[in-house]
A protein has these predicted regions:
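Short beta-strand segments that buttress and anchor functional surface loops
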Residues: 37, 65-71, 91-96, 114-121, ...
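Predominantly extracellular/secreted and cell-surface proteins with exposed
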Residues: 58-62, 67-110
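N-terminal targeting signals for Sec/Tat export/insertion, comprising classic cleavable signal peptides
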Residues: 30-55
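Bacterial N-terminal signal peptides
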Residues: 6-16
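Acidic, glycine-rich flexible loop segments
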Residues: 102-132
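N-terminal helix-cap/turn-to-beta initiation motif at the start of protein domains
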Residues: 20-34, 58, 85, 132-134
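Short, surface-exposed coil-to-beta transition loops
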Residues: 48-52, 75-80, 99-103, 125-130, ...
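Edge beta-strand at a domain terminus
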Residues: 107, 128-166
Length: 166
């Protein structure tokens, strides 16, 4: 085998294996989900109990998650995540905040996607938060968002939702 062919095989197959790994992982997040948790409408607000229902579909290296979370009569909000894996790197978008659609960028470690949420610039500075989307055992998923408190800079959990596959 020539050095060029060897180099090509080494370059292609690890990437193909990474895509296959991400496809298998994304399949664990596919399905109809329901659950509950707590959400803060902003980092300084008190947490509200919510119930959520989500529909998640994996298609190869892509994941679409759409649904809604409700806090009794206080609010109901549609939420959605669109992600695409490129090797071990993930990019996409998140909707569900009053700030508008945000960009998502991150990687996977084990059964957890670690994503940066980059909110749109609304005339001030762009704000960055984080989202962890985790496959927690068979038929369980957890979504956690964390962002800095605007006055103190302290990291605040703004959402923690535990979901079970229907």
């Amino acid at each position: 085998m020539t050095p060029a062919i060897t180099a090509l095989l080494l370059a292609v197959f690890p990437f193909s294996a990474a895509i296959a790994d991400e496809t298998v992982f994304l399949d664990t997040l596919s399905g109809n989900w329901h659950g509950s948790g707590q959400v803060r409408l902003n980092p300084g607000a008190v947490p509200l109990a919510v119930s959520c229902s989500l529909d998640s579909r994996a298609d190869g290296a892509a994941l679409n998650l759409a649904g809604a979370c409700r806090a009794k009569v206080v609010f109901s909000r549609r939420i959605g995540v669109d992600l695409r894996a490129n090797g071990t790197r993930y990019t996409g978008s998140y909707v569900g905040s009053r700030r508008g659609a945000a960009r998502l960028v991150g990687t996977r470690t084990g059964a957890t996607l670690n994503l940066q949420i980059i909110w749109p610039d609304k005339g001030t500075s762009s704000r960055v938060a984080s989202m962890r989307l985790a496959s927690v055992g068979t038929g369980h998923m957890q979504i956690v968002t964390i962002e800095p408190h605007p006055q103190t800079g302290e990291q605040v959990i703004t959402a923690k939702i535990e979901l079970t596959r229907n």
